[in-house]
């Protein structure tokens, strides 16, 4: 699967399970590089815009690997990617 399609699928899956993704340039003085947080009961994943697509796929896969995805159909290639990220 092309990296762009892979990332789009991961992004759609995150939204489907209630994770909003916000893109921010974190290359300044912050030590954070991307991550999941919970604000007022809602999940928010802050993605560093300075990360390349391969790293974004890795980061979002790691995030999703920690979530309960039971009962959600995920195409095999994406499910394998998420499983390998654990």
Please provide the spans of the model-predicted regions:
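Auxiliary, metal-adjacent structural segments of Zn-dependent hydrolase domains
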Residues: 1-32, 39
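Solvent-exposed, non-transmembrane amphipathic alpha-helical segments
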Residues: 9, 30, 34, 41, ...
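Anionic group-transfer/hydrolysis microenvironments
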Residues: 26, 50, 64
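Active-site scaffold of zinc-dependent metalloenzymes
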Residues: 31-54
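C-terminal structural segments of small proteins and small subunits
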Residues: 60-85
């Amino acid at each position: 699967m092309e990296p762009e399609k892979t990332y789009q699928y991961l992004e759609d899956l995150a939204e489907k399970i209630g994770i909003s993704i916000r893109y921010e340039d974190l290359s300044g003085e912050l030590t954070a590089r991307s991550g999941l947080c919970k604000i007022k009961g809602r999940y928010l994943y802050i993605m560093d815009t300075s990360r390349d697509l391969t790293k974004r796929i890795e980061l979002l896969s790691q995030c999703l690997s920690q979530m309960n995805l039971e009962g959600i159909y995920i195409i095999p290639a994406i499910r394998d990617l998420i499983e390998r990220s654990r």
